[in-house]
Structure formats: structure tokens, C-alpha cells
């Protein structure tokens, strides 16, 4: 059956700021306390969406979350009106204010793990929301992510959206950032590669930075998504690269159809994994980047592998990269050698995503891949699909509501909270989502 990969990109939120909240993500730590530009960040993301849509790659948008997220501050014991809660937390515990104001939901590669209908036992598309248990600021995302996905994939005959796994470290799940699918045409059954960093009883794990994904979580997600057990491989990420800042697998590997583009040191027991994939995926091709050509540290600083690998109708592929790759002489030299070599990659597309990159999120972090048949695509909420009209409407919306300068101190401004809620209220109407945010259901609630 014919099917296409649709990239659902996260729209950067109004409170995009640099707080260094993500230990193990070296860009996040390095840019802590710098001044951010939320308006520019949102426009950089929108431009990537539009240019890819114009190039023939189906593209859609996932909205940001409500931030600052007052309900969690109330859970932490701060009382009063919303304005009083903001004032108290800014004075008494500003780190909590930064956490509940994080715009991290823009990295929708962590929103959920997807199983296309060709891979599932019941023939539906399955989406399991990630619990993002390893980081407090990200663990807040799951309930609203679930509401958003249910509003976008709202046909229950074709889509099953599953709640996140229980919020415990044993079941730490980071979504599609630790998941790849390999195979032939998108509509054919594929091999799902789940990548984990640790498992109970296995001492092979990183020592400097946390392994956020567990094997136990990956196995549970595969069950929830009803993936045919014959179409699943579980593999461990190399703990040494996690300790060098590879906090998700999509920082060291990316797949598309029959191709796996990865670093030579991406996986534990890599040669064994690649042999398994060759045996189980027709036409499998591994493009392994030698450590002698690109150090892991350079892969992390440029986000070479946090790229998008996209298929054209003729079978050739486009590699979508952040500008940092072009600015690194060694990485750019390797990429041009890759273009000249015998493989499906025939074009490099480079985007300026500096605002997101400074927080540790490249092109692949910003998108959730969903393989859909034509019938399934028609069942998706049409208002989220990127086209000229939506692009112009979203740019106008960003111009109207987003600030062009934000510091940690600005998060305590009650006007920022009001701006954010008004913006999201308008956005849910624009995207025909209904009331997906807690403030819409509760009327903003004082107390």
C-alpha cells in the first residue's frame, strides 16, 4: 500500500529560554543564562517546515505547551492567584520557575513513539506518549502531549494514542528520539529498532551522564504500539558516547527506509547489530562514519546525525542539516565526500536553527516522523498540515505574540503568562484543536 512519511514539527513556545536544565546535553549546559529570542526561534522552525513542504515532503505542525505551567507550581506548595504564585516562586525558588517555563515540548522527537499501520497487529497507527522521566521539566509534558496528539490524530478507527508509561526511572522513555524504522517503501512492513541506554541487571551503562532510556520502557512501548514481534530489534546505545554528550540516539544515528546513517561508535556491539539488520532488512545499507573522520565530540557539537534523512519519489535521499555542520571544516568535508560516494544521499539541505541548537536541539529533535497511508493522512486534522496559508497565519501569529528577547528574570512577568495563554487560545482556534490546555478547561483558575 502507498504511504508517505509526514514530519510533524514542534512549534517553538513563547518562553523559549536558556536555563541549562538538561544535564547530559552539553549545548544546553554551555548556553545557560544567555539571552534568547523566542520570535526568531519560532520563525527559524517555521521556515524549515515550509521549505521542506515546498520541496515535496509532507509537513505538519504540533503546537507548544502552556508555559509557565502554574498547576505544577501549585503542586509544589505555592499558593495564591496565578500572579502571586509567579512572584513567590521567582523570589523563593527561581529554578522551579525556569523548569515550569521550559519550551522543551518543541522537540517533538521526544513526544511519542510511532508505529505505522503496516507494522501493527491491529492495522492501526499507534502513538505512545513518552514519559520523559529523566528530567523534571520534561516529565511535565506527557498529559498535554497526549491531549494534542488526540486532537490531531482524532479518528479512533485509524489511530490509537496511548498514555505515557508510569513515571518511574525503571520505565524512562524518551520517545522517537531513541527509535528508528528500517525497510523498503514506507507502506511495507518495516523493522523497528528500539535503542536503550540501560537495563536492570546490566552493568554496561554510562558513568558520567545519565542513560535516559531503559530497555524495559522500550519493550513496553513496543507492546503498547502492538508492533509485530517479528519486526522488532532492541539495541543498546554505546555508553561511552552517552558520556560524551549523546543523550539520545538521534544525536548519533538517523535512519530512513533501507539506510542507517550512524557513527562508527553509535551502538554497543555495533557489528553484531548491523549484521542482524542486514539479515532482516532487504537491501539494508549502513553508512558508518569512521571515528577517524568525525570525532564523537564533533558529531555532538555540529549535530551531524541529528539530521533528517528524507526520501524523494525517485528513491534518492536528502540530508537536512543544521548550519553548524557547514561551519565545521572536517564535518563539511566528510559530507561532501558522502555526496560523491555510492549511496542514496544526493543532496544536503542546510538550515539556520541556532536558537534551538543552543539548547541542544537540531533538525531531528524538532520533528516527529509519522508514516501514513493516503486514507490515514486524510483522517489527520487538516488544519495542522503545512501550506502557504498556514505558514503565513503562523508567522503573523508569532509576530503578534512572541517577544524578541527573553531572560530568566522575564519568566516572573505575569504579562508573559497572559500573553502565552492568549496566544495559545488563538492558536487552538487556528488549528481547530478544541480546548487542549488546562487553562482553557479551568478558566485560568485562581486559588
Swiss-Prot record:
Q: Which organism is it from?
A: Escherichia coli O1:K1 / APEC
Q: Where are the bilayer-spanning segments?
A: none
Gene from which this protein is expressed: astB
Q: Specify the protein name.
A: N-succinylarginine dihydrolase
MF terms from GO for this chain are: N-succinylarginine dihydrolase activity
The family line of this record is: Belongs to the succinylarginine dihydrolase family.
Q: Please give the catalytic activity noted in the UniProt record.
A: N(2)-succinyl-L-arginine + 2 H2O + 2 H(+) = N(2)-succinyl-L-ornithine + 2 NH4(+) + CO2
Q: How does it assemble?
A: Homodimer.
Task: List its EC numbers.
Answer: 3.5.3.23
Keyword Hydrolase assigned = yes
Per UniProt, the keywords (alphabetical) are: Arginine metabolism, Hydrolase
